[in-house]
């Protein structure tokens, strides 16, 4: 039985590797594997990612959900206007027409990869989407949204009540200068768990 389970895990992991072969992004394989494994280990009911772009990181959650059935929510406005609100658009080279194409390509790619079975895509800003979730309803939360001090701290305040005590908060680009403040604030409600990607990603556990 254990060999059969391992075989299934490996077969599904191949979907992530396939996604990594053609979906652009900056997620290291170490992080992809961590996010795949953490779903299988912690057996969540609800997983949320904010900041999807082309979907490279959320592919791990979607693949793992085929083994351990859980709901995966991918949240991104794919909006030039939304990204311009607090100056983050300086990091964005695409116009709105290109962002629309990226959104539709993401939907198509995940259908072709067979990764959309448990996936719900929400095309809203992070703040607006936070109102769609009940308090303490999220087991794993991955934040890869706008990395300004304002946006990241607003995300922390908006989403922390939605994450279960004992739930995971995975923060991307923790090595950015503008992400220092949100990490200091996070430690008031979370405990540090681990770093990934040489400090690029930081994982917290909600303690209160």
Task: Give, region by region, the residue ranges found by the protein language model.
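A short alpha-helical cap/connector motif
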Residues: 1-208
């Amino acid at each position: 039985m254990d060999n059969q389970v391992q075989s299934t895990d490996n077969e599904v992991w191949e979907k992530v590797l396939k996604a990594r072969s053609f979906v652009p992004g900056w997620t290291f394989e170490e992080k992809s594997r961590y996010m795949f494994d953490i779903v299988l280990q912690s057996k969540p009911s609800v997983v949320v990612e904010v900041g999807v772009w082309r979907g490279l990181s959320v592919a791990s959650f979607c693949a793992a959900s085929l083994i351990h059935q859980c709901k995966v929510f991918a949240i991104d406005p794919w909006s030039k206007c939304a990204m311009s609100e607090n100056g983050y658009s300086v990091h964005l080279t695409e116009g709105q027409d290109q962002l629309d194409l990226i959104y539709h390509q993401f939907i198509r790619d995940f259908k072709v990869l067979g990764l959309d079975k448990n996936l719900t895509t929400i095309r809203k800003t992070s703040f607006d989407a936070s109102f769609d979730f009940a308090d303490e309803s999220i087991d794993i939360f991955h934040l890869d949204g706008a990395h300004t001090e304002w946006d990241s701290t607003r995300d922390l305040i908006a989403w922390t009540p939605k994450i279960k005590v004992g739930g995971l908060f995975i923060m991307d680009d923790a090595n950015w200068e503008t992400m220092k403040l949100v990490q200091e604030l996070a430690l008031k409600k979370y405990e540090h768990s681990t770093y990934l990607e040489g400090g690029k990603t930081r994982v917290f556990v909600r303690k209160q």
